[in-house]
């Protein structure tokens, strides 16, 4: 109770002291204002006195004197108020001093009466022990046949609590011996070494310099005896700094050398790539085509075959030839492949390559013949250049081994027909053409859909695009209903008519090569070697598809 009253008296003294300080500050401000007014009135009175000496009229002198008297009166009032305020300030300062003295006395009493946390804990223990309660032993004494060694659970719990609360019986979980060197000039402590000790073997020898309930620090001299007298206690900051230095010293370990990470081989699973068939680079160098004496249309076909894809365009027709290039020995080896009529919106696949390109002046596409009309042989033209002849002599191809390495020999090969030449059998050529039995089997494969075919037929015109300007134009005849290809007669005039019906057979072409020139409208369109102009052959094929006949 006494402590509470002292605390209350101290708080009241602090409050009174604060009020007095505020009054003193206000009075000092008032004094400053009065002093400024006093100085202003003094200056005004001196100026009026100086002006009064130069005035000769009586009325003005009387007015100036009255004003001067009023100013002098105000000056006296201000001087008195300033003196009074200064006296009040002195009284307030004395009262503040008395309150401060009283506050200091109360604070001293509080320090003498105030108890620490340890004192409070001890007093609570003493009160618990002094409290009059019935003994537990008396309760269990009435129980018969109870062994003397039996300890009630409540009593055992109290004993355990006393052991835990007792500071002397506390066990250290971790102990460490730290050697510290202290600089007496700067006061800095340096950790020399730190040795962990077993907590069971640790003995609190030395002088306790720090204890916060969780950590205890004992000062021991170098000979493991108590430190010299006059050892001061350590501050929490110093203890934390020592523990930090000790932990850093323990964490330091010798450098372990190992192979760098980048020295180990790195194995990364390869990403499977999609198989795409694209024409290889330098296609014309890899596949050397020996052709001499062919027409302009054939040369354009060879050029376009090396450049990539080309599209034959007619009126409302798109012809796309997916024919991969194939090398051949010394002579032009070709296979004409019949293509289907497809809609205009059909896209070209990446593997498709064309063998011919439509001539700007020609009214029809380049010629394409049946695989049955494919021929192979030796090509030697009389007007061929010396360079081509040297290449023919140096380069000897085998038709089987001249294929690209990525093509299987067992799979069928697509060949392109480029024209006819006279071929002569010789023993020398047969030696180089080992593995070639003289026969190449070719077949015409047509893949179509009946629905697409019907749609395509609906879009096809019944006459050739340039037929009105041609000499062989005839009006279209009404066509019967479409039937299946297997049931249609080869001689019927339908859109499914074979395109090779009106083409020249091998025997007829051989006869035309040896026969004299006939005077026909199309004889002028022949090449220098006697073969038929490819544009005329293409016109024949186109007219054959449309059911017309070229004379």
UniProtKB/Swiss-Prot annotation:
Alphabetical UniProt keywords: Acetylation, Cell projection, Coiled coil, Cytoplasm, Isopeptide bond, Phosphoprotein, Synapse, Ubl conjugation
Subunit structure comment from the entry: Interacts with GLUL.
Numbered residues of crosslink Glycyl lysine isopeptide (Lys-Gly) (interchain with G-Cter in SUMO2): 125, 179
Region (Disordered): 248-280, 342-392, 449-535
Localisation per UniProt entry: Cytoplasm; Cell projection, Dendrite; Cell projection, Dendritic spine
Residue numbers of Phosphothreonine PTMs: 271
Ranges of Polar residues composition bias in the record: 270-280
Species, as recorded: Homo sapiens
Biased composition (Basic and acidic residues): 248-259, 484-495
Residues modified as Phosphoserine: 135, 321, 370, 384-385, 498, 515, 520
GO biological process: regulation of cell shape
Protein family per UniProt: Belongs to the paralemmin family.
Position of the Glycyl lysine isopeptide (Lys-Gly) (interchain with G-Cter in SUMO1) cross-link: 179
Residues in coiled coil: 12-106
InterPro entries reported in the protein's UniProt record: Paralemmin
GO cellular component: cytoplasm; dendritic spine; membrane
Tissue expression remark: Ubiquitous. Most abundant in cardiac and skeletal muscle.
Any Pfam family: Paralemmin
N-acetylmethionine PTM sites in chain numbering: 1
Record note on modification: Phosphorylated.
Primary residence: cytoplasm
Name of this protein: Palmdelphin
């Amino acid at each position: 109770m006494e402590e509470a009253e002292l605390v209350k008296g101290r708080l009241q003294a602090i409050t009174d002291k604060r009020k007095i300080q505020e009054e003193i500050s206000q009075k000092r401000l008032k004094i400053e204002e009065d002093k400024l007014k006093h100085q202003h009135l003094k200056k005004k009175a001196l100026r009026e006195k100086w002006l009064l000496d130069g005035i000769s009229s009586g009325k003005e002198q009387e007015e100036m004197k009255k004003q001067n008297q009023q100013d002098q009166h105000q000056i006296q009032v201000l001087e008195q108020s300033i003196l009074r305020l200064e006296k009040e300030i002195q009284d307030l300062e004395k009262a503040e001093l008395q309150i401060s003295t009283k506050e200091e006395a109360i604070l001293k009493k509080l320090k003498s009466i105030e108890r620490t946390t340890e004192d409070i804990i001890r007093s609570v223990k003493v009160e618990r022990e002094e409290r009059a309660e019935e003994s537990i032993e008396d309760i269990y004494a009435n129980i018969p046949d109870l062994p003397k060694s039996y300890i009630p659970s409540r009593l055992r719990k109290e004993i355990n609590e006393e052991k835990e609360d007792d500071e002397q019986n506390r066990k250290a979980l971790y102990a460490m011996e730290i050697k510290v060197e202290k600089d007496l000039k700067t006061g800095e402590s340096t950790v020399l070494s730190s040795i962990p000790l077993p907590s069971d073997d640790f003995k609190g020898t030395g002088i306790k310099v720090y204890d916060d309930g969780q950590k205890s620090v004992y000062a021991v001299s170098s000979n493991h005896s108590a430190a010299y007298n006059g050892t001061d206690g350590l501050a929490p900051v110093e203890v934390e700094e020592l523990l930090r230095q000790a932990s850093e010293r323990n964490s330091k370990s010798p450098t372990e050398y190992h192979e760098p990470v980048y020295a180990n081989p790195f194995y990364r699973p390869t990403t499977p790539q999609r198989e795409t068939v694209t024409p290889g680079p330098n296609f014309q160098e890899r596949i050397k085509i020996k052709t001499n004496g062919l027409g302009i249309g054939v040369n354009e076909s060879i050029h376009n075959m090396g450049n990539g894809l080309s599209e034959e365009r007619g009126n409302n027709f798109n012809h796309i030839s997916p024919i991969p290039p194939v090398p051949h020995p010394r002579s032009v080896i070709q296979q004409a492949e019949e293509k289907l009529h497809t809609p205009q919106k059909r896209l070209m696949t990446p593997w498709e390559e064309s063998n011919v390109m439509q001539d700007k002046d020609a009214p029809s596409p380049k010629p394409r013949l049946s695989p049955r009309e494919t021929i192979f042989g030796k090509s030697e033209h009389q007007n061929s250049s010396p360079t081509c002849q040297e290449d023919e002599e140096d380069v000897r191809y085998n038709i089987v081994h001249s294929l690209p390495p990525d093509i299987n020999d067992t799979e069928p090969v697509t060949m392109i027909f480029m024209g006819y030449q006279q071929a002569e059998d010789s023993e020398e050529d047969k030696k180089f053409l080992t593995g070639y039995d003289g026969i190449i089997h070719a077949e015409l494969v047509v893949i179509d859909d009946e629905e697409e075919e019907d749609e395509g037929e609906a879009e096809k015109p019944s006459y050739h695009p340039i037929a009105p300007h041609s000499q062989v134009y005839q009006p279209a005849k009404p066509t019967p209903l479409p039937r299946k290809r297997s049931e249609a007669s080869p001689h019927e005039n339908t859109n499914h008519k074979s395109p090779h019906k009106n083409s020249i057979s091998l025997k007829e072409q051989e006869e035309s090569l040896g026969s004299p020139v006939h005077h026909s409208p199309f004889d002028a369109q022949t090449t220098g070697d006697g073969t038929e102009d490819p544009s005329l052959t293409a016109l024949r094929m186109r007219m054959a598809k449309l059911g017309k006949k070229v004379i």
